[in-house]
A protein has these predicted regions:
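Flexible, solvent-exposed loop/hinge segments and secondary-structure transition points
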Residues: 1-162
Length: 162
């Protein structure tokens, strides 16, 4: 989860230090957060961590999407459970794929995020699919968009400053 949020995850930190950062900075989900975890700094909401899950091509996929307090900008995505084809669909969990989501803007017209074929021209809400993993990419796009739409619906009209 920390990898999806800004400024919390560093590879060289011990598990104890990572756990400390999590417990000191992250509030557990509740109705006011639309069931997302909340990252607070100096009492203000900095970002949300939205757990998402759904059926991949071969097995369930579970991930966390980090979203800035503006509810419009993605801070990152971390795929923590998947059993897709090694070297193909399993690439969704690698940084080469997930880093594409950083600073993408959630679209409010149509799909919040679009995963497009490799080589396609990308807009502000688009990332490239994993080459050779069309089914996994399509299913992950559906999981992400279902999770974002449900969360945005829950958060509609809520005050960010709490």
């Amino acid at each position: 989860m920390l990898a999806a949020l800004p400024g919390l995850y560093e590879e060289n930190l011990s598990r104890l230090e990572l756990h400390k950062r999590f417990t000191e900075s992250i509030n557990t989900p509740d109705d006011s957060s639309g069931d997302a975890y909340i990252l607070r700094q100096n009492g203000k909401i900095v970002a949300y961590a939205l757990p998402i899950s759904g059926q991949g091509f071969w097995a369930p996929i579970k991930a966390v999407i980090g979203i800035k307090a503006d509810k419009k900008t993605i801070t990152g995505i971390a795929v923590y459970q998947q059993n897709e084809t090694p070297g193909l669909g399993a690439e969704i969990a690698r940084a080469a794929f997930t880093e594409q989501f950083r600073d993408k803007v959630i679209s409010f017209d149509g799909q919040p995020i679009n995963i497009k074929r490799p080589g396609a021209v990308l807009g502000g809400s688009d990332v490239h699919a994993v080459t050779g993993a069309t089914q996994t990419s399509t299913r992950l796009e559906n999981i992400i968009n279902t999770g974002l739409k449900e969360w945005l619906s829950k958060m509609s009209g809520r005050d960010n400053r709490k």
